[in-house]
Swiss-Prot record:
It comes from the Eukaryota. The keyword Transport applies. The lineage of its organism: Eukaryota, Metazoa, Chordata, Craniata, Vertebrata. This is Long-chain fatty acid transport protein 4. It is a multi-pass membrane protein. AMP binds at Y243, I244, Y245, T246, S247, G248, T249, T250, G251, L252, P253, K254. Keywords: Endoplasmic reticulum, Fatty acid metabolism, Ligase, Lipid metabolism, Lipid transport, Membrane, Nucleotide-binding, Transmembrane, Transmembrane helix, Transport.
Length: 643
């Protein structure tokens, strides 16, 4: 702005006052421009203009399609119906576990059976039904069938047990629960605490003695249900589709609301931004209860007619064999998955596949080039975006290490920003005018996205819990009176506008591809340790993605039955949430508001040369906590100890 005003001033002064010829005026302006650092702008412009134009066109295309869907009140089931009409007999889903193949027509008929059956059982538009099962074709057919009826699906994380699992079912107010037979034991554990009015249905192998007494076998009931489309509910593009549970920033899992427009937007931005094709075949081994697997992956099938291969769980040893068997051209990943593949011994299969794109997030810069070159993958399509966020990013031109970009030239087109935060408290830093201070290139800051509720691409749908929404929204961020979504993630932007993931703030960290809520883990550990003070945080471990969980426990005597503690943890917490490291110390220091001071604990980490308190780590082979001495620390640092 200042540079522009200066140029105009020089132009007027040179021409009107000095009466110089236009050639001299031009040289004067060029001299001033370059002298004021304008050459940086020219450099950025030349290097990024093609990228920015392409990104802008993608944004405009998706925005136009979203507006059309809004006008015509289209929903995901309506959009899927048009996909079925285009190619009814094309393969839609393949389940690797049984080689079960569903065409688009079969998926359509199965989902309609689900809708008609639930309608016959009294469920109606606006009701909620929960799904608790491992990956398979039926998972997609179930929530899609619910959507056809206007019933909102609550997609429960299959790793959750007991309190967390019960919390998800209770807060969703589900009237029905469909669970896979493989999850029967987990349902039996909480059956006594479930609402007696909750209808229970089991899909898969049927053993009456292995499920709660009130459970019905769903599969034969669906075979008898009508396969025609039920009467369409009065739903619009901004109405609720389903709920995905996320740890958010604190506490037990929260239900993030996914509306039809959000589902479309997330899938479409990936499709157009990374130049996908309708004849691509996607290999999806990510959990379908998360947005990466169910929206970014399955969304390409439902909305764009791709074939998606579903795997129950990721297998490093079978990964490339599967890709060859099913002729996959796109694979989905999380950063940890890529490291597992690189740790596998070389094999012929990794050179015989047809994969042209790896799509996902969390791939570290240190292994990025090695991953793409060893496995001969031309395009790494890295993106950033939580289920509930309004500031998704895409690395459309495969810049190594970047999770996306924002134009330095036309930054106002996509209103996101990195803002300064206090390193210790993670509070937003504001200027004298009360507005958040934007970061300069190279300066880490929290990513925020401006909220515009009337714009489907900028709206924040939030969580079912209003209190959780309040914690994710800040005011006066871009300008006075506005609102912005707080991602809780620290990124850094380079001079060209590429964004790189740095850290996860708030009270979560990421481990084994899952967000771990420190508050939830702290509560569980404290309860198991007779309400001792416990601080949980993530620590970096060389050669691994994310942060490993570490728990600092206030234990004045230093005594703890760690063997029994490890056994109980197996029943109370999913594997990814169990602390890898333990630190026993006399007391935990707190802030004036009784929050644990974790900054120093994080900095000290688990190095026995720095930490003088007793340290322990979870030995994966022994299944218990053992002392962490200098020798064990060296093995962990060298990657010789499995965590």
């Amino acid at each position: 702005m200042l540079l522009g005003a200066s140029l105009v001033g020089v132009l007027l002064f040179s021409k009107l006052v000095l009466k110089l010829p236009w050639t001299q005026v031009g040289f004067s302006l060029l001299f001033l421009y370059l002298g004021s650092g304008g050459w940086r702008f020219i450099r950025v412009f030349i290097k990024t203009i093609r990228r920015d134009i392409f990104g802008g066109l993608v944004l405009l295309k998706v925005k136009a399609k979203v507006r059309q869907c809004l006008r015509e009140r289209r929903t995901v089931p309506i959009l899927f119906a048009s996909t079925v009409r285009r190619h009814p007999d094309k393969t839609a889903l393949i389940f690797e576990g049984t080689d079960t193949l569903w065409t688009f027509r079969q998926l359509d008929e199965y989902s309609s059976s689900v809708a008609n059956f639930l309608q016959a059982r009294g469920l109606a538009s606006g009701d909620v039904a929960a799904i608790f099962m491992e990956n398979r074709n039926e998972f997609v057919g179930l929530w899609l069938g619910m959507a056809k009826l206007g019933v909102e699906a609550a997609l429960i994380n299959t790793n959750l047990r007991r309190d967390a699992q019960l919390h998800c079912l209770t807060t969703s107010r589900a009237r029905a629960l469909v669970f896979g037979s493989e999850m029967a034991s987990a349902i039996c554990e909480i059956h006594a605490s479930l609402d007696p009015s909750l209808s229970l249905f089991c899909s898969g192998s049927w053993e009456p003695n292995a499920v709660p007494t009130s459970t019905e076998h769903l599969d034969p009931l669906l075979k008898d249900a009508p396969k025609h489309l039920p009467i369409c509910p009065d739903k619009g593009f901004t109405d609720k589709l389903f709920y995905i549970y996320t740890s958010g920033t604190t506490g037990l899992p929260k239900a993030a609301i996914v509306v039809h427009s959000r589902y479309y937007r997330m899938a479409a931005l990936v499709y157009y931004g990374f130049r996908m094709r309708p004849n691509d075949i996607v290999y999806d081994c990510l959990p379908l209860y998360h947005s990466a697997g169910n929206i970014v992956g399955i969304g390409q099938c439902l909305l764009h007619g791709m074939t998606v291969v579903i795997r129950k769980k990721f297998s490093a040893s079978r990964f490339w064999d599967d890709c060859i068997k099913y002729n996959c051209t796109i694979v989905q990943y999380i950063g940890e998955l890529c490291r597992y593949l690189l740790n596998q011994p070389p094999r012929e299969a990794e050179n015989q596949h047809q994969v042209r794109m790896a799509l996902g997030n969390g791939l570290r810069q240190s292994i990025w080039t090695n991953f793409s070159s060893r496995f001969h993958i031309p395009q790494v399509a890295e993106f950033y975006g939580a289920t509930e966020c309004n500031c998704s990013l895409g690395n459309f031109d495969s810049q190594v290490g970047a999770c996306g970009f924002n134009s330095r030239i036309l930054s106002f087109v996509y209103p996101i920003r990195l803002v300064r935060v206090n390193e210790d408290t993670m509070e937003l830093i504001r200027g004298p005018d009360g507005i958040c201070i934007p970061c300069q290139p190279g300066e880490p800051g929290q990513l925020v996205g401006r909220i515009i509720q009337k714009d489907p691409l900028r709206r924040f749908d939030g969580y079912l819990n209003q209190g959780a929404n309040d914690k994710k929204i800040a005011k006066d961020v871009f300008k006075k009176g506005d609102q912005a979504y707080l991602t809780g993630d620290v990124l850094v932007m380079d001079e060209l506008g590429y964004l790189y993931f740095r850290d996860r703030t708030g009270d979560t960290f990421r481990w084994k591809g899952e967000n771990v809520s420190t508050t939830e883990v702290e509560g569980t550990l404290s309860r198991l340790l007779d309400m001792a003070d416990v601080a949980v945080y993530g620590v970096e471990v060389p050669g691994t993605e994310g942060r490993a969980g570490m728990a600092a426990v206030a234990s004045p005597t230093g005594n703890c039955d760690l063997e029994r503690f490890a056994q109980v943890l197996e029943k109370e917490l999913p594997l990814y949430a169990r602390p890898i490291f333990l630190r026993l110390l006399p007391e935990l220091h707190k802030t004036g508001t009784y929050k644990f001071q974790k900054t120093e604990l994080r900095k000290e980490g688990f190095d026995p040369a720095i930490v003088k308190d007793p340290l322990f780590y979870l030995d994966a082979r022994k299944g218990r906590y053992v002392p962490l001495d200098q020798e064990a620390y060296s093995r962990i640092q060298a990657g010789e100890e499995k965590l």
